[in-house]
Amino acid sequence: MNPFHSSCWNTSAELSNKSWNKEFAYQTASAVDTVILPSMIGIICSTGLVGNILIVFTIIRSRKKTVPDIYICNLAVADLVHIIGMPFLIHQWARGGEWVFGGPLCTIITSLDTCNQFACSAIMTVMSVDRYFALVQPFRLTSWRTRYKTIRINLGLWAASFILALPVWIYSKVIKFKDGVESCAFDLTSPDDVLWYTLYLTITTFFFPLPLILVCYILILCYTWEMYQQNKDARCCNPSVPKQRVMKLTKMVLVLVAVFILSAAPYHVIQLVNLQMEQPTLAFYVGYYLSICLSYASSSINPFLYILLSGNFQKRLPQIQRRVTDKEIKNMGNTLKSHF
């Protein structure tokens, strides 16, 4: 993503409901739950759907696919799977928490959402390490930095994400609360289970990958600026690291890191705070809703960041558009010939 993508963070409402007791009543749905939040996330996801399809289409249609392209394509696919599952959760929110799609679909949607969260974190981390070796240590691990092996690495990350999400496949189900509402929720048996699972999810998908990602990009920036200063001090007429490239790389990294932190951190902080609260306050609800919107907004922002911050995507889009147009014209000509 970007190298940072958070479109893939698990913001499903069921994880905030502390559903360790099946008799725990689902709170009366407010206008925010049933109208405002579903509408906002619906708009955000619609935009993200278009943007991520554009990214995947651009990469697939490109003749020369690079190693970063494979990582970005996988992140965009994860965003798409995540966004496609959102209408079901939006429908549940709009109906005041009622789930009408049955138990199997509840398990599938919730589990894929969590699997995508693990996958996004893993892909972002590995891609950051790959960028470090490509720019700072270009002659190391070259045998692993091929398109074929990068595809295998990404498949391995998806498989590992599926395994890490096994608790969700087991415990996500339709729960009937005492007010009669049947909701798709994560059914844990005790507050301790909720505590340990929240810590497990937060650490593995945010607090563990974040330092690795930051270290990789800090080292990349330090190396790039060091090379630029060396060339500048040597007064090279044609420096290998021009100032424009350094500034562009710095700006891109700062933007992507900022988007990652701003979109993911609030939700995970809210989840940790929720563990200590017996009765959520109005401020907590406001923060929770904002964290959800920020998490899903990243799914819409990331594709456009790829396009705006990457010169390769800006060059590829017109080329692919011309190729598609030429192909359509050729097909139309063949069709006309067949009629005469």
UniProtKB/Swiss-Prot annotation:
Main location: membrane
Transmembrane domains' residue ranges: 35-57, 70-92, 107-129, 150-172, 199-221, 253-272, 287-309
Residue spans, topological domain Cytoplasmic: 58-69, 130-149, 222-252, 310-340
One Pfam entry name: 7tm_1
Cell location: Cell membrane
SUPFAM superfamilies recorded: Family A G protein-coupled receptor-like
Protein known as: Melanin-concentrating hormone receptor 2
Gene designation per UniProt: MCHR2
